[in-house]
């Protein structure tokens, strides 16, 4: 399922979670990026957790923090269609249509059955 489990983790890993809990999103993202192997290893469900956090910010119209988190997710999980789809949505909401299109296209390239990405690109009148 989507349960997030925490294994015994080194100190480096807890720093990012503390930063997030203090609302220091960019610093938290940088801390994860700096020690990405540790975070990926020690947080099962990290991709889903970051995606959910990104959408929480997006839904609160805090697009800047959503962009930090969702971009990080594409870097940590470059083979995931969903990370590009979500980042594309945040970019679109921010008015970065050209970048949004690139991310939706990457998402569809990784998962040709991504109906949301296909729908959005069709709405934007982009050739797929």
Question: What are these regions, as identified by a protein language model?
Answer:
Residues 39, 73, 106-107:
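Canonical positions in the second alpha-helix
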């Amino acid at each position: 399922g989507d349960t997030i489990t925490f294994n015994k983790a080194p100190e480096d890993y807890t720093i990012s979670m503390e930063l997030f809990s203090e609302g220091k999103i960019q610093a938290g993202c940088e801390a994860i990026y700096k020690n990405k192997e540790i975070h990926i290893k020690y947080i099962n469900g990290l991709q889903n957790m970051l995606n959910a956090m990104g959408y929480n910010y997006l839904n609160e119209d805090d697009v800047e923090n959503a962009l930090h988190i969702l971009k990080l997710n594409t870097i940590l999980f470059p083979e995931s269609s969903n990370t590009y789809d979500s980042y594309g949505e945040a970019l679109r909401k921010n008015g970065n249509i050209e970048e949004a299109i690139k991310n939706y296209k990457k998402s569809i390239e990784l998962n040709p059955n991504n109906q949301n990405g296909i729908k959005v690109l069709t709405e934007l009148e982009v050739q797929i």
